[in-house]
A protein has these predicted regions:
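Low-complexity, Gly/Ser/Thr/Pro-rich intrinsically disordered linker/tail segments
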Residues: 265-284
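Acidic, Ser/Thr/Pro/Gly-enriched interdomain connector segments
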Residues: 1-34, 73-78
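Conserved hydrophobic/aromatic packing and binding residues within compact polymer-binding modules
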Residues: 44-48
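Loop/turn positions that initiate beta-strands
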Residues: 225-226
């Protein structure tokens, strides 16, 4: 049974079991130790290549299932919103099937509030609300009711985030949804998700730079649930090259790839500067 991702440098009975299976399939010469070394890495990559899997040398959920003939978790069983394009759903589904339950749950939570940039979205599923957290301290969803939105629009210090017609756009969207759309800013999305899923306590709060700089370890091999970081901004990497990010008043919460984001005011996709690094969260 799959319990964790296995990679070079790790050890344990599950590593030995995987190595023994690779031996029986002819990909590894011998399996006498419980350590995932260089020979194991090469054999895993060879197995992945031969079986149409992502060749990353990591025994994730899909690679484990292929090794042992298990189908306990498949992309079909992962509830990715049907409003996304088939290519996005497939890429994200494959990635989510290979990570831990908590990473998958965090990503699926964020995805339900995202509009896909490349799919000509008709409505925002989540608003960009400066200073807002996706989940409140009582773990309730931060739904932008009529009174909340009007109070937000009265705050002159936040005008740079909703002026120029963005307030009208958001109010129209809210009316169509019967004021059921949640709101947050970029760091508030991450903070809210961390609260909701018990990674940090309900009082946890931090800005984008603190989240990336103090709560992650930089990685060049991101997996679903890692954080996408740049100065003053943060998003959630959900796999397959996609991120969920609260991008701004004219954009709301979006599923983006290569920082291409849909502008609901202009009806066009914009390209933003690349992420500076990905961070592997220290708590999960």
């Amino acid at each position: 049974m799959f319990t964790r991702n296995l990679k070079r440098g790790m050890s344990g009975d599950d590593v030995l079991l995987a190595k023994q299976r690779l031996v029986s399939l002819g990909y590894l010469y011998a399996a006498t130790k419980r350590t995932f070394g260089n020979d194991t890495l090469k054999s895993v990559k060879a197995f992945q290549s031969a079986n149409g899997l992502e060749v990353d040398g990591i025994i994730g959920r899909l690679t484990w299932a292929a090794l042992f003939g298990e189908i306990e978790t498949t992309t079909a069983a992962i509830s990715i919103p049907e409003r996304f394009t088939p290519s996005a759903r497939q890429a994200i589904g494959i990635a989510l099937a290979q990570v831990s339950d908590v990473r998958r749950e965090i990503c699926l939570d964020a995805l339900q509030f995202a509009a896909e940039a490349e799919n000509n979205p008709q409505a925002m599923m989540g608003f960009y609300i400066r200073g807002g957290n996706l989940y409140n301290k009582d773990l309730s969803l931060n739904v932008m009711t009529e009174s909340k939105l009007k109070a937000y629009f009265r705050r002159s210090e936040y005008a740079p985030y909703f002026d120029g017609g963005r307030d009208d756009l958001m109010m129209e969207n809210a009316l169509r949804s019967m004021f059921a759309v949640p709101g947050c800013d970029c760091s508030g999305m991450i903070v809210g998700l961390m609260r909701k899923h018990g990674i940090y306590d309900a009082g946890f709060d931090a800005n984008a730079n603190t989240l990336g700089g103090s709560h992650t370890i930089k990685t060049t091999n991101p997996q679903s649930g890692d954080w996408a970081c740049k100065s003053g901004h943060i998003g959630l990497y959900v796999g397959g090259g996609y991120e969920v990010e609260a991008a701004g008043g004219a954009y709301g919460i979006q599923l983006s790839k290569n920082r291409r984001i849909f502008n609901f005011l202009t009806g066009k996709v914009q390209r933003f500067s690349a992420w500076e690094y990905y961070g592997d969260p220290k708590r999960y």
